[in-house]
């Protein structure tokens, strides 16, 4: 369950008559009401208090209804479904005094809803967030997919352990221009960049990083969490500067490359291993694995040589391929 808190402010006051705290502040004057979602569920009783020293002449409205919902400094709302959520406003004499927005977070059969993001099902089911790091600097990128294109808002926070909840900072989520097709359906891809402030590339990780994405679609709130060690999400950039050198009196060529600029240094400590493969029009040769940055291969006409990299000492993900034409 999401950490719960009851926030009291001078701008608006949200009270609960339920003995279990089931409402908390997402941002200023925006509150999430957590609901058990089943037929005839009792819902949650929420008491809204208008931010004004006045006691008389106050009326309440909602963006869900054209009617006046009540009068007085407080309004009691029984929140059972999305029709009970939305923005509540108190007025006096045509003047808006304060507003409170109620969002719903559904729980069905003890499980929080996950309707907004696409389950990518890799490396396991319920994998909504994917994260990668190009090196051990503490910088990483996360992304997720959604079929929803409007009325959508994301916020991201991250930490490594409870002792330093602000030790990892994340920027704003941005919509990628990349089109992602899954099962003949197009999805929007969102990405976010994060950085651990006190990262030590050579240090052994003892606590995982946790990333939480909060998603709001219309009046629905959901959150998604991914927990990992940087070493488990490493995916180097492809090797750079691939070059071919013909060998005298031989059908072979020497292909050479360099470490990617983004990889951690020194390379004597942060070492990579490489995979080399000749790829023709109709077939691919077997892969060669090596630690050095050159190899001798037979390069056929109209073929290409491709090289990828991964961490030599830890079973990281392989990089994308870098390639050079034989012709």
Curated annotation (Swiss-Prot):
CDD domains: FN3. InterPro entries: FN3_dom, FN3_sf, Hematopoietin_rcpt_L_F3_CS, Ig-like_dom, Ig-like_dom_sf, Ig-like_fold, Ig_sub2, IL-12. Keywords: Cytokine, Disulfide bond, Glycoprotein, Immunoglobulin domain, Secreted, Signal. Residues 1-22 form the signal peptide. GO terms for biological process: natural killer cell activation; positive regulation of activated T cell proliferation; T-helper cell differentiation. Disulfide bonds join 50-90. PROSITE patterns: FN3, HEMATOPO_REC_L_F3, IG_LIKE. The keyword Disulfide bond applies. Residues 238-327 form the Fibronectin type-III domain. One of its GO terms (cellular component) is extracellular space. Its main location: secreted. GO terms for molecular function: cytokine activity; cytokine receptor activity. Glycans are attached at residue 223. Residues 23-106 form the Ig-like C2-type domain. It is found in: Secreted. SUPFAM superfamilies: Fibronectin type III, Immunoglobulin. Heterodimer with IL12A; disulfide-linked. The heterodimer is known as interleukin IL-12. Heterodimer with IL23A; disulfide-linked. The heterodimer is known as interleukin IL-23. Also secreted as a monomer. Interacts with NBR1; this interaction promotes IL-12 secretion. Belongs to the IL-12B family. Cytokine that can act as a growth factor for activated T and NK cells, enhance the lytic activity of NK/lymphokine-activated killer cells, and stimulate the production of IFN-gamma by resting PBMC. This is Interleukin-12 subunit beta.
């Amino acid at each position: 369950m999401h950490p719960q808190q009851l926030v009291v402010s001078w701008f608006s006051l949200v009270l609960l008559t339920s003995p279990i705290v089931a409402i908390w502040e997402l941002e200023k004057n925006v509150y999430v009401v957590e609901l058990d979602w089943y037929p005839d569920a009792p819902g949650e009783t929420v008491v809204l208090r208008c931010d004004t020293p006045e006691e008389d002449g106050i009326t309440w409205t909602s963006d869900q209804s054209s009617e006046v919902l009540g009068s007085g400094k407080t309004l009691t709302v029984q929140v059972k479904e999305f029709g009970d959520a939305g923005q509540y406003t108190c007025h006096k004499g045509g003047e808006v005094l304060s507003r409170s927005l109620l969002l719903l977070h559904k729980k069905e059969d003890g499980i929080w809803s996950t309707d907004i993001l696409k389950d990518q099902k890799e490396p396991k089911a319920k994998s909504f967030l994917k994260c990668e790091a190009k090196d051990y600097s503490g910088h990483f990128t996360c992304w997720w997919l959604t079929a929803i294109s409007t009325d959508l808002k994301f916020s991201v926070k991250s930490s490594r352990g409870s002792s330093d909840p602000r030790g990892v900072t994340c920027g704003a989520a941005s919509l990628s221009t990349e089109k992602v097709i899954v099962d003949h359906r197009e999805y929007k891809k969102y990405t976010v960049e994060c950085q651990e402030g006190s990262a030590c590339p050579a240090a052994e990780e003892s606590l995982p990083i946790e990333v939480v994405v909060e998603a709001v679609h219309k009046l629905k709130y959901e959150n998604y969490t991914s927990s990992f060690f940087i070493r488990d999400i490493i995916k180097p950039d492809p090797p750079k500067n691939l070059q071919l050198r013909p060998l005298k009196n031989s059908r072979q060529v020497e292909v050479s490359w360099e470490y990617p600029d983004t990889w951690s240094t020194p390379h004597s400590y942060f070492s990579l291993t490489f995979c080399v493969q000749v790829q023709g029009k109709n077939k691919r040769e077997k892969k060669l694995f090596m630690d050095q940055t050159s190899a001798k291969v037979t390069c056929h006409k109209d073929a290409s040589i491709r090289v990828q990299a991964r961490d030599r000492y830890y079973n990281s993900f392989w990089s994308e391929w870098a390639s050079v034409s034989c012709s």
